[in-house]
From Swiss-Prot:
Cell compartment(s), UniProt: Cytoplasm
Primary role: Involved in the biogenesis of TorA. Acts on TorA before the insertion of the molybdenum cofactor and, as a result, probably favors a conformation of the apoenzyme that is competent for acquiring the cofactor.
Cytoplasm is among the record's keywords: yes
Source organism of the structure: Shewanella oneidensis (strain ATCC 700550 / JCM 31522 / CIP 106686 / LMG 19005 / NCIMB 14063 / MR-1)
Cellular component terms (Gene Ontology): cytoplasm
Keyword Cytoplasm: yes
A Pfam short name: Nitrate_red_del
Alphabetical keyword list: Chaperone, Cytoplasm
Protein family: Belongs to the TorD/DmsD family. TorD subfamily.
Protein name stated in the entry: Chaperone protein TorD
NCBIfam families for this protein: PRK04976.1
Gene name in the database record: torD
Length: 217
């Protein structure tokens, strides 16, 4: 597989993770996520030992969501976890995990920083997604963009400074708040995202180090 193909595959994973944090799963999205092509994708992703458990959980939940009431229940889980700003929710904004203030403000430093990244890449948050730019879905989507349009060093810098710096804290909060829900879909999604980011970061580090060694040899 060429570097272009690898980066395209990486971008697809980032876009998938982004989409699942961006909005609840509706009937149309469910059909896409359970199609034959999607099942092959999930199976391939689940072959990696670090991803197998969360992928299996997510596949099972998605395949069981054939009842309308089950789909509504998952949508309610999404709302309760990510849209309701209480101690029992897991707000997906970097500023809430990176700032030391007792009550960090949305649209603060991390939002401004992310907005500048988007501006430099001639991108912007779409109007139908009225969220601060430091929302995890925006950052994952941007990382997917970088995977196909930026050098490895730039990708690693963004991944390390803007996502990996707070993702583990967010995942702990998701798992804690999602524990009362039986299917555990969003706990699995959060765990998969963290595992993916860790592995991708390692891949980028290895690629950069290999390039340096080739240059010096």
């Amino acid at each position: 597989m060429s570097n272009v193909d690898i980066n395209h595959a990486r971008a697809l994973v980032y876009q998938l993770l982004s989409s699942l944090f961006a909005r609840e799963v509706n009937a149309q999205r469910l059909q896409e996520l359970t199609s034959d092509a999607a099942q092959q994708f999930w199976t391939q992703l689940g072959h990696e030992p670090e991803f197998s458990a969360p992928v299996a959980t997510m596949q099972k939940v998605l395949n069981d969501l054939q009842r309308n009431d089950a789909l509504l229940e998952l949508a309610a889980d999404y709302c309760g976890l990510f849209l309701v700003g209480t101690r029992h929710s897991a707000s997906p904004y970097a500023s809430l995990y990176l700032n030391s203030e007792d009550e960090p403000l949305l649209f603060g430093q991390q939002h401004q920083q992310m907005s500048e990244f988007l501006h430099q890449s001639k991108l912007q948050v779409q109007s139908h997604f009225p969220e601060p730019a430091d929302h995890l879905a925006v950052m994952l989507a941007y990382m997917g963009h970088l995977a196909c349009h930026s050098e490895d060093a730039a990708q690693l810098n963004f991944l390390d400074a803007c996502i990996d710096s707070w993702l583990a804290k967010f995942v702990v909060k998701v798992v804690e708040c999602d524990s009362k829900h039986r299917n555990g879909f969003y706990s699995a999604l959060a765990s998969l995202t963290l595992a993916w980011v860790k592995q991708d970061k390692q891949l980028l580090e290895q690629t950069i180090n290999s390039s340096v060694e080739q240059t010096l040899s």
